[in-house]
From Swiss-Prot:
Name of the protein in its database record: Nucleoprotein
GO CC annotations on file: helical viral capsid; host cell; host cell nucleus; ribonucleoprotein complex; viral nucleocapsid
Function noted in UniProt: Encapsidates the negative strand viral RNA, protecting it from nucleases. The encapsidated genomic RNA is termed the ribonucleoprotein (RNP) and serves as template for transcription and replication. The RNP needs to be localized in the host nucleus to start an infectious cycle, but is too large to diffuse through the nuclear pore complex. NP comprises at least 2 nuclear localization signals that are responsible for the active RNP import into the nucleus through cellular importin alpha/beta pathway.
Post-translational modifications reported in the UniProt record: Late in virus-infected cells, may be cleaved from a 56-kDa protein to a 53-kDa protein by a cellular caspase. This cleavage might be a marker for the onset of apoptosis in infected cells or have a specific function in virus host interaction.
Amino acid sequence: MSNMDIDGINTGTIDKTPEEITSGTSGATRPIIKPATLAPPSNKRTRNPSPERATTSSEAIVGRRTQKKQTPTEIKKSVYNMVVKLGEFYNQMMVKAGLNDDMERNLIQNAHAVERILLAATDDKKTEYQKKKNARDVKEGKEEIDHNKTGGTFYKMVRDDKTIYFSPIRITFLKEEVKTMYKTTMGSDGFSGLNHIMIGHSQMNDVCFQRSKALKRVGLDPSLISTFAGSTLPRRSGATGVAIKGGGTLVAEAIRFIGRAMADRGLLRDIRAKTAYEKILLNLKNKCSAPQQKALVDQVIGSRNPGIADIEDLTLLARSMVVVRPSVASKVVLPISINAKIPQLGFNVEEYSMVGYEAMALYNMATPVSILRMGDDAKDKSQLFFMSCFGAAYEDQRVLSALTGTEFKPRSALKCKGFHVPAKEQVEGMGAALMSIKLQFWAPMTRSGGNEVGGDGGSGQISCSPVFAVERPIALSKQAVRRMLSMNIEGRDADVKGNLLKMMNDSMAKKTNGNAFIGKKMFQISDKNKINPVDIPIKQTIPNFFFGRDTAEDYDDLDY
C-alpha cells in the first residue's frame, strides 16, 4: 500500500479554511435565545427541540401553533426522505475519504466513523468548550490542538491473492466542511437525522456494554439494567432522546443532580440548574405508567431541599419500574451505510416507518460487514448487530429467537466484543464477516411496557423491556423483586411509598401464566399487509435475559 507512515496508518487531511466554505456567512447575526420558562407538569409529549437547543421566543411558539399537523403518511414520507439523504451524505463522505469499493462502504466501522465525525462537527457547544480549554492548556505549556478539525479511523480494503482484509487509516476533515456538506444534502439543519444517529449509537452501547459502574455510582442495583436504556444518549438529543430513555436512566440523572445539590446548596438557586432538574423530574413523571409512581415523583418535585430522602424515593421508583414498566419508545436504527444502498437494493417505497415493516424489510435486504476483533465469532457478532439495530438489549431472548429462527445467547455466552475497535487493536490485515442473522418473521415495535402481567425469570438481569408487540409472557424474576420490596417505608411520605409497594405486590401476585400484548401476532417477513398472523412460539430452553450473568466490557472503561 502507498502513502504509509511509520505506524502503518494512512493519515489523509482535507485542507480548506472555514472562510472558503462558508463564503462570508459566518458573520450572520444569531437569534437571541431567551431563558426557558418552567412549564407545569403535563403528560403531553413536547415537540422535539434541536440538538443546539430550540429558541423559546414568542415568534417561534406562534409559528408552531400555525403549523399544520402532519398526517401519518406525510410523516412516513419525511422519514423516508431523511434516511435516503443520510445515505447520500455517507456516499459523499466516502468519496472525500477515497474509499469507493463496495466492501469498504458496507463496513459498519466506516459508517460509525462517518457518523461520529458528523456528530463532532455539528456539536458547536463542545467545539467552543474544547477551544477555550485548549487555549488555557497552551498557556500552561501543553500542545496546541486544532479543534476546527475532526477525524476518525476508517478501514481500507486490501486484496491479497484470494484473501480480502482491511487496514486502518486515519482521516481528518474540517468541521465546517462536514457541516456545510450535511446541511446542503439534507436541505435543512437536519436535526432529526442527528437525533436518529445518536439513538443508533446509544442502542449499540446498550447491547455491547454493561453499565454496572454507572448504576452503582448512583446507588442502584445492577439488576435494574433493563430500566437503563439510552444511558449514553447526549443531552442534545432532545425530546426524541427522552422518549428512548428508560426510567432508570432518568432516575440516575435526577439522583446525580441531587448529589450535586447536596454538595453545593446554592446550585438550585441558579434558575438554569433548577429548570434543568425540574425538567428531568417532569420527564420522569411522564414516563411513569402508574398513578402511584407519578405520586412519588410529585413528592420529589415538591421537596424544597432535595436530599437523602428523595434519593431513597427515586431508588424505590426505579425498583417499581421493573414490575410496572414505563413507556420507552423503540425504533429500528440502521448504520447509514445501509441507507446509502437504498437505490441499489430496489427498495421501491416512498414511505418509511422506523417502527414497522419498511425498516425491517430494509434490514433483511442489506449486506452489512463488520471487522472481526481478536477472538470474535462471526455468528455471535451478527447477534450483537441485530440487537443493536432493533434496540433489543433488554428484550426477551425467546422472542428474538422466534422472529429470526436463530437461538440467541446471553451476553456472557457470546464470543465477541463491541464494534468499536480500540487503537491498540488496530493492525494491518484485519478480517471481516457478513452479519448474517435475518428476520424470518416481523412484528410492529412498541412503546408500551406490556404491563398486563408478570412472568417467571432468572438471576442477574431480573426483568425485560419489550421491544416487539407480540403476545407472550413477560419475563420477570419474582424472587429478586421480592428481595427489593423488603425496605423501610417510614418517613414523610409513608403513604405514597406504601401505595407503591402495594401496587408492586399486587402485580407480583398475578398468575404467571397470563400474557402481555394480548392478541398481537407476528407475520412472515413477506406478509407486509399482515394478512396471515402467526402465534409466536416461545422456546423454554433459551434464557430470557441477555444480561443474565454479564461479562461484557463496561462502557466507562472504553478506550476511545
